[in-house]
């Protein structure tokens, strides 16, 4: 009563036998008429494979429904096919976007991703990262701010030969990775505010340990200079890149004898916190005080009024950082540093003075 078996020696018969057992890389190589090394290169998106060969191998992989076993890949290539994203950042919106971008790159290149939360100010940070790399057999790590700028960690990773790339590292720490011209972006935002007639503009900084905090403060001061405005230290309040710190900083600014007419917060979470504080004080945004941020994370669209902000393509930045890391893993020295463009997103949280 069973179905008809394919004639012995026919391609269909061969496929029947392959389905009866797990398809191996040897089966793909034999069917495609290439070596196992060539199949491995195609699966790992490595160079030095002709487009015609690549297409033939990919067609056989699809036909046989071959899926490489993780342990076999490790043994064949002496890699774990695993990278980690190291982070210590209170902005969950920002981290989620970066993480999704890193995942995009990992999935495209058949790698797995480990998320590793760390404390930047932990005196044992370097040892913990070294232990993570060794115990998990990581192929490399993506560093996010402020971990990107830990000199001792960078030196140890280099000494161990651990490939790494960074998201928004300081100029002197840039190897493989990605960044935006943050100083130029903030200058553009300041030009937007001054064009609306604002002359008393406050700034809520990020955490002092983050390179981005320094760049954005520099952009704020340069923007004032270009507009012919004097820097006033009383209008600068330190935050920590969190909603709570933005709320707290805005409360302090509202207590000034002469309050600001506009607030530039160093990220969207703090800008959202500032808007909450202003509304709680019985004032309106932007009628009484304009507010703007940086990043264009989802919260910028979720609050009311919608937030004017600098858009840096955070998901794309995560993808690019991981892509450059994977290049570095495959061929040391091949990973590069990529600068991505920013754009101003002008929304309803900013307006002319007194309007």
Segments the model singles out, each with a brief description of its role:
Residues 84-86, 137-145, 202-204, 257-267, ...:
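Periplasmic-binding protein-like
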Residues 70, 88-97, 115-124, 147, ...:
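Hinge/beta->alpha junction and helix N-cap segments in small-molecule ligand-binding domains
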Residues 1-20, 78-191, 195:
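Alpha-helical recognition/docking segments in bacterial nutrient-uptake
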Residues 1-80, 354:
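N-terminal helix-turn-helix DNA-binding module of bacterial transcription factors
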Residues 2, 251-355:
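Flexible loop/turn connectors
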Residues 108-109, 160, 225-231, 255-259, ...:
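Short helix-capping segments at alpha-helix termini
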Residues 31, 36-41, 75-91, 140, ...:
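Short beta-strand segments enriched in small/hydrophobic residues
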